[in-house]
């Protein structure tokens, strides 16, 4: 692998949107399953092309408030979860403020901190889990903490006990806890826990649960009313309202039967088992994902492997260094079982040198 080839592995953006009949992409974390059928009934009669309320469509805010047990006024609809996190940072941070991230992290987190003049600092996960002793030391002096569970890229679910400890620490220290729970409905083992409190902001999305990534509908909620007002003020000048059409489709998605989520979860579980067992059989060192749809195996020479798999075998994987860890790669199993099996076979061929 030449220096020029090494330099071509610039980041996930080089792979996002690539497709082809012979390409197997374990890259993007975008569900390939369909959204709820009822969301499409919005389209034929949609006529609302004017600006909408900055904070969101009232009926969508009310539906989400009912689900999360907060007042509607404490919900803000955003352009995906990414905007929700960006708004949190732009509202909270002054130049030089430190934000604690768990490592490995979702690749966008450090850059979002830096764009908003903050300084990312880290606490290392142990096999995907928060080490409370290390966390306790690392959180001192921070303005905010960002925790993601179920995790991307780890697939790990933090325990209620751990998250309640994190919640208490942050509220006691008056450090804002931004809790990214976009995969909360994709849990195979363990239990989801949503932290709460004056210094907690919960972030969620319709992208993963309802397979609506391209519509860009996320939201945040918090018990802190003053913080919510400051968020809305920031959004007023940054992006105004989230797409009205997308919000109407999101509102319909909330009416989908519970079987929609449980059916999708079983599909994800089967795919998880397929790729996890397949990688184990190939000799990889990895833990079993408890949620989301990623595996994060340890590999030797990950840059060479990612490049060769792409150029020689037409298999896309993501470098672990994009997520803060240099000796691993990330594979998403957001693709059908046949493609997972074909991708595993190509990885086997790569490992055998054929």
What kind of feature is each model-predicted range?
Residues 308-317, 323-354:
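PLP-dependent enzyme catalytic core of the Aspartate aminotransferase-like
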Residues 91-148, 168:
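PLP-dependent aminotransferase-like
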Residues 2-87, 255-256, 353-354:
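N-terminal small-domain helix-loop-helix segment of the aminotransferase-like
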Residues 251, 266-276, 286-298, 324-327:
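Conserved glycine-rich beta-strand-loop-beta hairpin in the small C-terminal domain of fold type I
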Residues 116, 172-173, 282, 313:
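Helix C-cap/helix->beta junction micro-motif
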Residues 71-75, 95-98, 198-199:
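Short acidic capping loops at alpha-helix termini that bridge into adjacent secondary structure
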Residues 199-269, 349-351:
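Conserved core segment of the aminotransferase class I/II
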Residues 126-191:
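Active-site phosphate-binding strand-loop segment of PLP-dependent enzymes
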């Amino acid at each position: 692998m030449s220096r020029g080839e090494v330099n071509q592995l610039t980041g996930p953006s080089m792979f996002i949107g690539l497709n082809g009949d012979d390409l197997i992409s374990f890259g993007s974390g975008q569900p390939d399953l369909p959204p709820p059928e009822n969301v499409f009934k919005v389209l034929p009669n949609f006529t609302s092309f004017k600006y909408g309320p900055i904070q969101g469509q009232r009926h969508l805010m009310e539906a989400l408030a009912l689900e999360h047990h907060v007042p509607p006024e404490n919900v803000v609809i955003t352009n995906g979860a990414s905007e929700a996190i960006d708004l949190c940072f732009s509202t909270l941070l002054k130049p030089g403020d430190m934000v604690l991230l768990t490592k490995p992290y979702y690749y966008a987190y450090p850059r979002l901190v830096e764009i908003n003049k903050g300084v990312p600092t880290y606490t290392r996960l142990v096999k995907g889990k928060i080490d409370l002793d290390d966390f306790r030391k690392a959180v001192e002096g921070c303005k905010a903490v960002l925790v993601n569970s179920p995790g991307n890229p780890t697939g790990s679910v933090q325990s209620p006990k751990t998250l309640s400890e994190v919640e208490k620490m942050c509220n006691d220290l008056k450090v804002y806890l931004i809790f990214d729970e976009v995969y909360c409905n994709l849990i195979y083992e363990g239990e989801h826990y949503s932290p709460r409190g004056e210094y907690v902001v919960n972030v969620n999305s319709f992208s993963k649960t309802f397979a609506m990534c391209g519509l860009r509908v996320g939201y945040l909620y918090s018990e802190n009313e003053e913080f919510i007002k400051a968020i809305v003020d920031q959004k007023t000048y940054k992006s105004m309202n989230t797409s009205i059409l997308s919000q109407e489709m999101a509102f319909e998605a909330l009416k989908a039967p519970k079987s929609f989520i449980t059916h999708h979860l079983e599909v994800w579980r089967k795919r998880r088992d397929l790729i996890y067992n397949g990688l184990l059989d190939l000799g990889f060192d990895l833990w079993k994902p408890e949620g989301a749809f990623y595996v994060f195996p340890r590999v030797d020479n990950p840059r060479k492997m990612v490049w060769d798999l792409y150029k020689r075998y037409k298999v896309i994987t993501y470098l672990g260094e994009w997520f803060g860890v240099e000796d691993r790669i990330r594979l998403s199993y957001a693709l059908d079982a046949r493609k997972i099996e074909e991708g595993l076979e190509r990885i086997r061929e790569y490992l055998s040198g054929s």
